[in-house]
């Protein structure tokens, strides 16, 4: 199997790209052997789709569903999956059947479809399930429901929804806290040794932008200490990337030809703003204004950090896209810090009103050319 085949995103729906589906299907034996051995992940392989179940070691800020912005949308998704569970593949249903089912399962304000916000959230969930190939629109447009609770749309169940949720090794009704979901397959296994430790290290490197010693087991960095060179060679050969291991952090940096997942910086204005901010942060740290802890972190007062973000806007704002030039200060700070947190550049320590600056900030920064005079006022 070629390296390109190994790099494929193992979540190909046959109906969308048959050629890619069959290419992955031909290579799935070797891919399954690798991900089972190194990551402890399972592959679902059937006539509908091929999916790699990527279960993280540590839930991170960026791992939610990006299209969702509220808890209610996750509730709607779970009830929708319950609704589809009773439907056959290719079975059709109209939107009012779903809304009536949801109201019966969870009566109250959350399923009051006369409220525009509820309708908007449900449509966002349905659009997500369409994107994921769980349902398809057969007739109509969801805008009519957005405008009026009586609006109808005809959907078709593809049968793929039953493979969306993770299969747990234990009855989750026994769980009492979020931590119970973490790595439930390692229940009653010595997690700091052998196979489980290797799976943790590979997952943390491949599924997140950064690995920090303080976040997980210290045994993970012991593994990197002894096996890091061999692991680096292997991943660099397979995925066209470069692994860097430090005292308190480790990173998988994508190469120019790497096609594995999302990468920073993305080609957008917000990424440019972050890189400009990183340059300012670096100046503070190199100037000993902001101190570094033994774990390679820097703990800064939240107000002081937000002041730096605003300084970046004041100094470089003329070169920003119009959206960010005109954005109110509070909204600008939130957009920038949320994006930094999403990529694991910072952690918000809300109970202490502080920002923890992580080592990944030191890996990248940006600046405008010295002769740059500002942005185009006509830019949209």
Regions found by a protein language model. Name each.
Residues 1-10:
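Single conserved hydrophobic/aromatic residue that forms the stacking wall/gate
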Residues 11-19, 89-111, 206-218, 291-324:
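Short acidic, hydrophobic short linear motifs in intrinsically disordered regions
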Residues 146-199, 360-380:
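Short, amphipathic alpha-helical interaction segments positioned at domain boundaries
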Residues 22-68, 219-287:
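Long, low-complexity, charged/polar intrinsically disordered regions in eukaryotic proteins
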Residues 71-94, 271-299:
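Positively charged, polyanion-binding regions of nucleic-acid-associated proteins
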Residues 27-31, 112-131, 326-339:
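Short amphipathic alpha-helical interaction segments
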Residues 82-155:
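Internal, well-ordered domain-core segments that constitute the primary functional module
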Residues 40-41, 126, 130-141, 239-243, ...:
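A short, conserved structural fragment
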